[in-house]
Amino acid sequence: MHSQFTLLDSFLTQTQPFWRYEAFHAYRSEALPWGVQHPGLTQWLNSLSLQEIEEYKADPERLTQILTQFFPSLAEIKRTMTVAKPPCIPSLPLPKHFDKGIPGRKWQQIEAMGKVLIAHNQGKQWLEWCSGKGYLGRILASVSQQPVVSFEYQAELCHSGQQEADALKLPMHFVQGDAFANDSFNLFEPVTHAVALHACGDLHVRMLQYATSAGVEAISFSPCCYHLTHDEHYQAMSSVAQNSALKLTRQELRLPLQETVTGGERVKRHRQQEMIYRLGFDALLSQQLGFSSYVSVPSIQKSQLSLGFAAFCAWASKEKGISLDLECADFAYFEHIGFQRFWQMERVSLVQEGFRRLLEIWLVLDKALYLQEKGYHVSVSEFCERQVTPRNLVVNAHRTKD
């Protein structure tokens, strides 16, 4: 695992110009982020039709095959960094209607994670970190019949989760608390198997720190939202990552999260329309008022998009308190600029996509190596298929026996 990380770290360091940029802001520069370093890559990007851009975005494997023509070592790195696929585990013996009230894809994630955790169970009790209503904990309690402590910040979720667990007669106890408060450390005991599904940023980091300090029997977690941290730059956990030349910004930590599989064609079109409107509004501000930097606009209800670009500009200028002469604005012109900028953003982001998973593996390996350094036997694998969620990596660790 150490040699894997070192190899990956070297590759990402050498290829920084091709992934360390914000595609959203790339349209503001006439030059591509990598300048004149790779004219063949630039020529290929500029030759793509809009349909081809969409097709490559929907098919990461096909995109990787193309990108390896420009980065010959990319294919070998991806092969070396391949993690174990989801294991073939029989269905769990769960009662009927156990998934009541849980959206289908979310339930698939929870059930898949539950299977992996049961297969790797090492402790005598579970600690479900950042539990929400305890959906994952219900599976663990039902199948293992071991007690589950579900730790959650939001009191209403604790109350609802406890009621449902009691109705199912499950050995679950909800604890409301702040993960960053010192007393939350007391939840970790040597016989505990600490688990977290998609715990965000600093939350999964805090769990690992507490769990290793307490010397818990086992730790299993699937990280998410790496950018949700108090620090401006990524704080590496393992000694090898701390020595890396890569000092990732909070914004760069968003990159692995930009691949999504949720939503259908309607959701995709809504996203495109909203981005075109935002970029068109930005162009209007730039040309009419001389704004030199992008103005962030609040989220908008998707139903409002159907009112058209002019209505969006009126709404956005009101939200931001900006005085605009909308009567004289050529909305068709600025909407077209937004359209062009959106597809330039999508075009440039294709190159980043070839590195996105590798950056996520870099982040996950840092945590895995940290656990190794703390005396745990560690494995990294996928707990479900990408189509269920791209955030499908799980780290399983158990204390090394003396």
Put a short name on every predicted segment:
Residues 133-145:
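Conserved SAM-binding loop of SAM-dependent methyltransferases across substrates and taxa
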Residues 161-162:
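Conserved SAM-binding loop
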